[in-house]
Structure formats: C-alpha cells, structure tokens
Amino acid sequence: MNSRRKFLKNLTAVGATVPLVSNIEAKPKKNKGPVILCSRGEMWGEKVLKPGWDILSNKGKLLDAIEISSNVTELDPEDTSVGYGGLPNEHGVVQLDASIMYGPTHNCGSVAALEGIKTPCSVARLVMERTDHIHIVGKGAQDFARAHGFKVENLLTENARKIWLRWKENLSSKDDWFPPSTEPYDEIRTTGTINVLGIDSESNVAGITTTRGLAYKIP
C-alpha cells in the first residue's frame, strides 16, 4: 500500500509540473536571414556566394540560390575539386556525385557516379523535385539528366589529365593503388567536396553537397 501511495504521489507531482513545462516555450529569435555560406569560404567564398546572395537578398527562391552558388565551382575548369575539371577516376573518367536537401518539405535528391554532366547538383535537384526517388546512379543518372536537357560532355580538362597521368606514372610497383612512399599522401589522393548552405527570410534551410570524390578512385 505504501508503495502504491508513493507511486500515486509521485505521479501527481509529475502531473503538476506538466503545465509548467508546456508553458516554458522557446521564443523564436528575431529572424536574421537570409544567410548563405559555403565550405572553404576563405578560399572562394565571395566568388561562390555572390550569385546566391543576389537571389536571396532579393527574396528569390532558396533552392535557386544554393544551386547557382554551387554551380560556380562545378563550372570552373581551373578547380580540380568538383564538376568540370575535377580529378578523374583511375581510368581517367570524371565521375561526380551530388546531393540536395530542402528543409520545408524534408525532401532530398542525389546522384552518384554521374559522367559527362558539369553540374551534378542541378540533376540532384531534379531527382528531388520530379521523381519519387532519392538516389540515381551511373548511366541511369546520366540518362535522367539527358532527358531533362543536360548536355553530355567530356569533363576531363587538360590540367586534370596531366595530373592524372603523373599519378599513373608513379603508381606503386605492387599495383596496390596506394601512393608512392616518396610523396605526401594528400598530394596524390586528394578529395574534392564543397558544401553550400542557405537560410531564407522565412528561416527555411536548404543545403547542397557536390563532389568528385576521391581522386583516381576505382570506378
């Protein structure tokens, strides 16, 4: 009986606190948006973010803003990290991955091992907006892109080709895909990924990641 009484007493005490807890609601801070940011901003922040900021600051669409900012690096042939000009796989073929997420709908879309398309994040957005899929890969991703008007092109620039050839010439004699011991690992097997995040004036959040993955990866 004592244990039952103690249980009911404790239950009553807990119940009494419920209204107090429910009344302690976090008051939203005054919105400070819009905001747009990117990884490695110290290197290319102004160049990458300005197109997206121009859209957001004029009350344009959040997804348009982060996509156009991501496209800046994807379309830059001098940048070997992502998109056009990215370092290829071991066969000298550039394969790209990208993903996009949109806070208001909780939806996402992505592509992987996409060849011949300079702006994979734009294809990922179409996967999110025009299909019930989350992820499309390889030839299927390329076919999907072509069906939506994307042009298939050779993404291997002369600069990236020379870097790849230098890697091929210095492959391990054991054929084990590890870099030669005479050179630093990060100079041989670099990764290339960028991220762009945005918040609009309504505090909606969205983000894009675009990458060519590990340089000289096994396809």
Predicted regions and their residues:
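Hydrophobic h-region of N-terminal signal peptides that target proteins for export
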Residues: 17-22
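Alpha/propeptide regions of enzymes that mature by internal proteolysis
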Residues: 2, 11-12, 16, 27-219
